[in-house]
């Protein structure tokens, strides 16, 4: 599809509503205004007009807004028609507009894509539009808005600019080797490089916070039947999300709850009790439990404190520990402290965190909440942050690795050419975040996840 086409889409959610908005962008937007409204509205002024069919009879009436390019969201001529939000009315108006030559339905995210291609937004800002719409908490929404307003892009652009200056300095040292001053060994380049690396580390720390805000943490509650897994899910969720009985094997499928701990999204997953099951339904539930465990960020290993005094997970259930993916963090949760009389709280045992609590009474659950937040490095005190995606983290990590390699070349062999190449690669990795160096395939994947009218 051509970017020269004029596109139209509904900008409001599908279904009935008080207001429904159609957005038109492109060279033919002016023709749409003349055909549907009978005139071109005054730029950036609300005009109350009938929306006319092909034969001139009104289909609806409402507000028309005209934004001539380049002073519009997409950078093109944009017309917005704000009418009544009935699906039939909007469908009739959409069909009327599509009768005009050169106008087609927009692809998902095509309005934002055009804004990016016309330099109205960089790629990180365009992604922030979708993140703002999908925000699941107030803190995530504020951070997404910061990204949309350019906070993340400004940090990245500052790093790119610093790398540009450093590359100029390094390449000057390479091009003028006969100068009396040895630029590579006089310490100035190393000092500048260390400064850029420190700034990059700070951005990476904020980006990790932003990624947590956007994607959350996946925590799976696992253990033997009747250990109190469903009771813990209910305690963390603050509601009766799971059925709790004294019958072993009550939970036979995966249960999911989405909560927030001081703004950090948490995906809690309750699983079927793990055992050798003869029942086919329970067996399938146990297999699903293992699938969830393998994809978790952390596992809460639930232990019935009345059945064992052991605290080392390898001693409590060695077969379970052996099957866990390598490097998957585990928190041992000894439940039923209200019955055993154990002291509530958090401790460390053989490299694993151990929490004693009572899921039934809720005692010690707040300790677990704080532990989950701290284990992911989530900092609630960070203000003015931004959201980040996995591709952003990967790009920042790649840039950091190139700078480390460059520093090794500088200090190990004074290899200016190799240092310059590592700086170039780091700069390229950072530029992928804002879209300065990004493949068309990646752009297609990013914008295809947007709403149709965005």
From Swiss-Prot:
Binds 1 potassium ion per subunit. It is an enzyme of class 3 (hydrolase). GTP binds at residues 226-231, 245-251, 270-273, 335-338, 358-360. (6S)-5-formyl-5,6,7,8-tetrahydrofolate binds at residues 23, 80, 120, 454. It is found in: Cytoplasm. CDD domains: trmE (cd04164), TrmE_N (cd14858). HAMAP family: GTPase_MnmE. This is tRNA modification GTPase MnmE. The gene is mnmE.
């Amino acid at each position: 599809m051509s970017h020269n086409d004029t596109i139209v889409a509904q900008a409001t959610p599908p279904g009935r509503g008080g207001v429904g908005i159609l957005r038109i962008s492109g060279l033919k937007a002016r023709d749409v205004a003349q055909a549907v409204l009978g005139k071109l509205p005054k730029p950036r002024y609300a005009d109350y007009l009938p929306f006319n069919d092909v034969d001139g009879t009104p289909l609806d009436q409402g507000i028309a807004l005209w934004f001539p390019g380049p002073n519009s969201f997409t950078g093109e001529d944009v017309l917005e028609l704000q009418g009544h939000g009935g699906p039939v009315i909007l469908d009739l108006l959409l069909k009327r507009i599509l009768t005009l030559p050169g106008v087609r339905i927009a692809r998902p995210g095509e309005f934002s894509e055009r804004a990016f291609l016309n330099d109205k937004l960089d790629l990180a800002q365009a992604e922030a539009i979708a993140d703002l719409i999908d925000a699941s908490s107030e803190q995530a929404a504020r951070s997404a808005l910061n990204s949309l307003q350019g906070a993340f892009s400004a940090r990245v652009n500052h790093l790119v600019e610093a790398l540009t200056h450093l590359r100029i300095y390094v390449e000057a040292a390479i091009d003028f080797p006969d100068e009396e001053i040895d630029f590579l060994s006089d310490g100035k380049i190393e000092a500048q490089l260390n400064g850029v690396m420190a700034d990059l580390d700070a951005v990476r720390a904020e980006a990790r916070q932003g990624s947590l805000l956007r994607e959350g943490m996946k925590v799976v509650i696992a253990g033997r039947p009747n250990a109190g897994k469903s009771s813990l899910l209910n305690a963390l969720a603050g509601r009766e999300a799971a059925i709790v009985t004294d019958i072993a094997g009550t939970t036979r499928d995966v249960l999911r709850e989405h909560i927030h701990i001081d703004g950090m999204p948490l995906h809690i997953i309750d699983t079927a009790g793990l055992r050798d099951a003869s029942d086919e339904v329970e067996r399938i539930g146990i297999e699903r439990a293992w699938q969830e465990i393998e994809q978790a960020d952390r596992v809460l290993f639930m232990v019935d404190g009345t059945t064992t005094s052991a605290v080392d997970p390898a001693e409590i259930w060695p077969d379970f520990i052996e099957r866990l993916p390598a490097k998957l963090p585990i928190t041992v949760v000894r439940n039923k402290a209200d019955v055993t009389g154990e002291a509530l709280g958090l401790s460390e045992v053989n490299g694993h965190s151990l929490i004693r609590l009572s899921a039934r009474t809720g005692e010690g659950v707040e300790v677990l909440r704080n532990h989950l937040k701290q284990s992911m490095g989530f900092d609630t005190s960070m203000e003015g942050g931004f959201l980040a995606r996995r591709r952003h983290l990967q790009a920042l990590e790649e840039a950091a690795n190139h700078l480390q390699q460059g520093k090794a070349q500088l200090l190990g062999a004074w290899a200016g050419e190799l240092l310059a190449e590592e700086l170039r690669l780091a700069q390229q990795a950072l530029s992928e975040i804002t879209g300065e160096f990004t493949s068309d395939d990646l752009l297609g994947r990013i914008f295809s996840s947007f709403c149709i009218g965005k």
